[in-house]
From Swiss-Prot:
Domain of life: Archaea
Family: Belongs to the UPF0228 family.
InterPro entries: UPF0228
Pfam families in the cross-refs: UPF0228 (PF05727)
Protein name from the UniProt record: UPF0228 protein MM_0400
Length: 133
């Protein structure tokens, strides 16, 4: 039996919209960013669920809007040929055709999560409200 789901995606209320990808073996850029934050007394890196996520051979690091507009921060990124990219936090709610919300079998949830995370534009997927029966 196949179950069809509709996806309601709400991106309007989420923050932390910028990130950089840093090669997992490149400690120099991370060290220089930490040093720059200390010297400038600024918070360029955001501690969040997106900070330090490993994606392939890189780490995804969320950065503040303040950082995106900071010349010193941008010069460090330029030195290491790294660019700031924009992302969207996306909350997905599954609804069954009968309108019942917040239900998805665990097997379907894991399959969708794996498929979504194989897309290079998607950083990470968290599944909530699964039916483990």
């Amino acid at each position: 039996m196949t179950t069809n789901y509709s996806i309601d995606c709400n991106t309007g209320s989420m923050g932390n919209k910028y990130y950089i990808m840093v090669d997992k073996d490149n400690r120099d850029i991370r060290r220089e960013l930490r040093k720059g934050m200390e010297e400038e007394n600024k918070d360029w890196i955001i501690s969040s669920s997106a900070t330090g996520i490993r994606k392939g051979h890189s780490y995804v690091i969320a950065v503040s809007e303040q950082a995106v507009n900071d010349e010193k921060f941008l010069s460090i990124l330029n030195k290491y040929d790294t660019q700031v990219k924009k992302f969207v936090w996306c909350y997905i709610r599954f609804e069954k055709p009968d309108g019942f919300r917040y239900w998805i079998p665990e097997e379907d949830a894991v399959k969708m999560k794996n498929e979504l995370e194989n897309n290079e534009s998607i950083i990470t997927v968290s599944i909530d409200y699964i039916n483990d029966q």
